[in-house]
Structure formats: C-alpha cells, structure tokens
Amino acid sequence: MINQNEYQRDYVRVLIIRADIDKNGLAYSKAAEINDLIECFRLLKNGFLAYSTLGELLKTFSKYTNGNEDLSQKMKRLRNKLDFMNHLRNKCTGHLDDILIDKAIQWEPSLFTKQVVESEHHIYLIYKTLLESAINSYMDENGGQKYFHMEIDLFYPPNWNDFINFMAESQVDSMDFLDDLLSEIKKNLRLIDDCDDLFLQAAIASKTDFRLPKKGR
C-alpha cells in the first residue's frame, strides 16, 4: 500500500525530472541548430544528470507499474537508454577520472598541438573528445560499443546525427513515461482543499526540523 508521503515525494521527483529533461532538451537542441557546439556540449553534460536520476529512480517508480502493462512496457523500453545515460553522466559529468581523460587524449592527439592549445576553440575540442570517449567506453562483453554497435566520431555527420537522435528519442520516451506516471500519482494524491486542513498543515510545518540524519548513524 502506497501512503500519501510516498505519493507526495514521487510527485515532486517526477515534476523536477520532467522539467529538467524538457528544458535541457530544448536548450541543447537549439544550441545545435544554430551551430553553437560549445554551448551544446556544455548543455548535454547537464542533460545527462536528469536522465541518470530518472534511471536511479526506476526501482522506486516500479510500484506504479503493478497492474499497468502500458506503463510497465514504457519503463522497460527506457532502461537501456537510461543505463547508457548514467554511464555518460558518470564518465563525462560526475567524474573527470584519469582513465577517461587518458583515453580521450590518446583518441585525439591534436588536443595538445600548439595550434589547438592556443585556439579559442580548444575547450570545444576537449568537450567533444571527452564525450566521444565516454560514448565509446560504454561497451558490451565483447568490447564493442554497447548502444550504437560502432565507434562514434562526432565530427562524422552520420555519427553526430545518430547521437542527437538518441538524445531526442530519450527525451520523447522519458516525457511520455513521466506524463503517464504523473497521471497515476495524481489519481491518488490527496490535496488540501479547505482552510481548516491548511491551518493544520501550517501548524505541522512550524515544527519542521531541518537537521538531516548523518549517513551510517
């Protein structure tokens, strides 16, 4: 049995993730359209975080799929995309680890040519190469790229289109899933609809203790 606290928490989670995916998607798509690729790569890095968060919450949200085959199938279709997004977030946004950077430098030796280092476009090439390295390091058990099934070079237009299409499909599928999930939650969400109830909740609010428990204690 799902209680009101769970419904409220999940409602907040869904609204935040949905808004982030929507606004980030519009922003990096617009940047790509006007060929502002530095801004596009920067926004993509931010965009991975919302998808990664959604992936981490699928287990929490799975309780809403019981008896709802359509929502269950939408969640299943998202899993592979969100697993890939989580990898990109970890490698390209959350952790700038030594191994990935070393792979990026090996993959793009021109990063440290004098001409490139002194160019105003140096950061663009760094963003691009780190993203490629993160994409290509998402491997299956045979050492092949796990999602695209080929090595990706974002300077190669078909590869760039494949990646942008992946991001667009991920946005559409995620928004569709989140909209359906939101509808399920709202059916059971008890809203404050009279002054007496509001005053009661305000009294409870005045007793809020903002100290958070320490982990491991």
Question: Could you tell me what each predicted segment is?
Answer:
Residues 1-84, 99-102, 108-111, 117-217:
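Amphipathic alpha-helical interface segments
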Residues 87-90, 94:
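Long, charged low-complexity segments
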